[in-house]
């Protein structure tokens, strides 16, 4: 059996959570120029003839709403640290003091003046820096989640592309085999006409042709569904036209599960986000404990007495946490519970990621064996069986039922081989996501 056409390399992005965030800002073209944005919005026709994963990925990174939303959440979080670390806004006030109700006494009495004042609240040293740290940790966590969103969308795109390519590949197989079956029907009919065959052989071939037509109808419906799912990820109308995809090809994946676990601990944006959640919660606990300390208020006033000598006054106040047992104490309890929650979430996330890696690695291993089995043994043997049965039928040593059965077996095994290729590629994509890797960013993977 001839090898399938080669799909262009699934170009990836340099790994690591920090890199994901950086690429999200620039290299992944999440902020295209106006001309590029116009191309993205008006670019539906560019996929009408053919589609490949590399172009689809670029389009997705520029247009997918999940990525855009994650990016904006990150940018919003980046704007908070400066706000949290700034002093409260000062208060400016004014007032007029008069000595009596009968007349205005400013300028004629020391007890009459116009006052201008300013007041500034100053939190206890360390509070503002802790507030800024908490906000910065949250911004970092949102950045990690932004990287996770990129990974998730790219993986969903690849899985949806594999589904779309599988349906197209299946349609090609069934249509090709439909032509072959029509030839078998013609051969059976020719033998029947000269009295060397049976009418039931012709009828069996026609029944099998009807079955293939039904299969084509089902596959066409699946093609429309797969195209709609792919368009959804691309942020295009569900019925937007999509051309012929590249055929699914076999990839080699040599990483062990232990190696992938080590990679995940360093690069997984979900694990990074969980750790930053712990850091944020611990900083929040430090801030809650700092609330036991008083804040200060600085004040300055100027008294204008018109023709008399003006006066000024400065002062300071302390905001005492008098009801600490009802307020600050419970704030510390709340923050401590938040730390426990964040640590538990980190542990749960770690367990989920590592378990997912083990499970997906087992799926990849099993799927690769099936691909090798079908591609290297089952399908070639089925082809030989059909060729042998066809030759035997021509000379009368094999009946038509045996020939038709050989054809049916080959058709099913070719379809199954395509399904196993798609299942293998999807499992590899999901495993890369779990380990925090983008496509083609795995050193142990190479094209065959």
Model segments located where?
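Periplasmic alpha-helical coiled-coil/stalk elements that build and connect Gram-negative outer-membrane
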Residues: 2-10, 148-265, 363, 367, ...
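Acidic, low-complexity, intrinsically disordered peripheral segments
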Residues: 2-10, 29-45, 416-448
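Bacterial N-terminal signal peptides
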Residues: 17-31
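Small/polar, glycine/serine/threonine/aspartate-rich low-complexity segments that form flexible
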Residues: 42-49, 93-131, 243-257, 286, ...
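Amphipathic alpha-helical coiled-coil scaffold segments and their short linker/junction regions
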Residues: 57-61, 197, 201-202, 206, ...
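A glycine-/polar-enriched beta->alpha junction
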Residues: 58-68, 75-90, 105-108, 116-133, ...
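Hydrophobic/aromatic residues within transmembrane alpha-helices of membrane transport systems
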Residues: 60, 118, 164, 230, ...
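Amphipathic alpha-helical coiled-coil segments
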Residues: 69-81, 149, 153-174, 183, ...
